[in-house]
Amino acid sequence: SYTYRVRIEYIDGFDNREVIYSNESEAVRNVDDPVLGDVVIMGEEKEGSVLEARTDSLSDDDGIASIDVAWERSRDGRNWVSLTGENTKKLNLDQTVVGSQVRVKATLVDRFGVETVLHSQPTRIIENVNNVPSGNVLIRRVSN
């Protein structure tokens, strides 16, 4: 949103210093540069493991002001729902995501305030781990 003009200084044929200014330009507007790079998920796709969202390959010629991440899950690979409260770069895989795919939704804001939303590739279906049963066994004798 700046304007520019040119200032030219020169010495004329009579040894006089001359200064000329151009007219101001129109306001220069930001052209949104595309975000380059990918959001990548690292880790084992199994209950009890931790996945990590990697955003370090993302770049924007306008500079990056912020990157926020959120995790989403899907049972069918088409309909995605947010995992409430999961807004950090790490996701602990618990029973709630078993049988689902997960992906990262990254919201990047550049230094001009332009927001870009990117999604990682979805994981494979999160595997279940057979949890060890807990509790006590009670055996009663039933007689006739």
Please state what every model-predicted region is.
Residues 1-144:
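Ser/Thr/Pro/Gly-rich low-complexity disordered regions
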